[in-house]
């Protein structure tokens, strides 16, 4: 029995009828949690009746281990409420949130709203139950999916901090360097726009970061170059999984270095790569 029903369901996972872990922490730590069933071996006659005085061999049951996580019930509940509010306001199909200690990577909350009831993991609506078994399984897999680490997304402007890191660490830009944003940059035959129509005009790098200005980051990316960007990606672990103790973590998706030209470098500088919600937090 799971006392909190839906809370952190896509992190905890659940067990099957044989008490074997199926998803989440339950399957990842299954060999430590499941314990060992006890048994008694003895002699019986042809009718299966135990023979008096026969030798017995006993194997005592062994309890499974306890598992302590970094999840905080209060923070998890708070994050759930925040996700539900956003989901309702934005009419979103799902909302995810991670609360993490930036010093050591401990996860205090991981929410994938809507969650499911751990005590009824196979329940489906009447409409979905009417589908064939293959379709039902697809619904269940989607319902159980931990989108914080099983799915990748384009992070958008969140990625600009990585370009900024590359520029500053490799001394290709200083905070007071000046740039000009007319609202776009022409890269080869492509016109790549800023999010602000008409542009930000003259601005320092610091102001470009504050304004989340695409042309500024395209310029910084060009200064850093392909080698410098990929060096920074490697140092920040973008080519690797985080190694979280949960199953099914997806890998980052980005251009092969040999295929990155001027246009790809420009767009890469402000976001069009793909990685998990968790990878974004870890980085």
Residue ranges and their predicted role:
Residues 45-56, 71, 102-158, 162-279:
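Beta-lactam-recognizing serine transpeptidase/beta-lactamase-like catalytic domain environment
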Residues 95-98, 108:
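Generic short beta-strand
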Residues 54-95:
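Conserved, well-ordered alpha-helix/loop/beta-strand core segments that scaffold catalytic motifs
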């Amino acid at each position: 029995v799971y006392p909190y029903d839906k809370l952190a369901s896509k992190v905890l996972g659940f067990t099957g009828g044989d008490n074997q872990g199926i998803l989440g922490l339950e399957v990842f730590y299954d060999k430590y949690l499941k314990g060992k069933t006890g048994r008694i071996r003895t002699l019986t006659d042809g009718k299966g009746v135990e023979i008096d005085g026969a030798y017995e061999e006993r194997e005592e049951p062994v309890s499974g281990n306890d598992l302590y996580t970094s999840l905080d019930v209060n923070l998890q509940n708070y994050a759930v409420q925040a996700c539900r509010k956003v989901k309702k306001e934005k009419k979103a199909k799902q909302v995810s949130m991670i609360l993490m200690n930036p010093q050591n990577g401990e996860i205090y909350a991981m929410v994938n709203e809507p969650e499911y009831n751990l005590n009824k993991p196979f329940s489906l609506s009447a409409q979905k139950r009417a589908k064939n078994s293959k379709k039902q399984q697809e619904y269940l897999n989607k319902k159980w999916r931990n989108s914080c680490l099983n799915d990748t997304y384009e992070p958008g402007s969140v990625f600009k901090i990585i370009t900024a890191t590359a520029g500053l660490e490799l001394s290709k830009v200083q905070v007071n360097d000046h740039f000009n944003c007319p609202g776009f940059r022409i890269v080869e035959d492509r016109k790549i726009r800023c999010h602000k129509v008409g542009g930000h005009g003259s601005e320092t790098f610091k102001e470009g970061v504050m304004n989340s200005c695409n042309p500024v980051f395209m310029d910084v990316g060009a200064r850093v170059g392909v080698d410098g960007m990929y060096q920074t990606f490697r140092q920040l672990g973008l080519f690797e999984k985080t190694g979280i103790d949960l199953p099914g973590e997806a890998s980052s998706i980005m251009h092969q270095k040999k295929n990155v030209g001027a246009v790809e470098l420009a767009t890469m500088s402000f976001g069009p790569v793909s990685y998990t919600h968790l990878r974004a937090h870890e980085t």
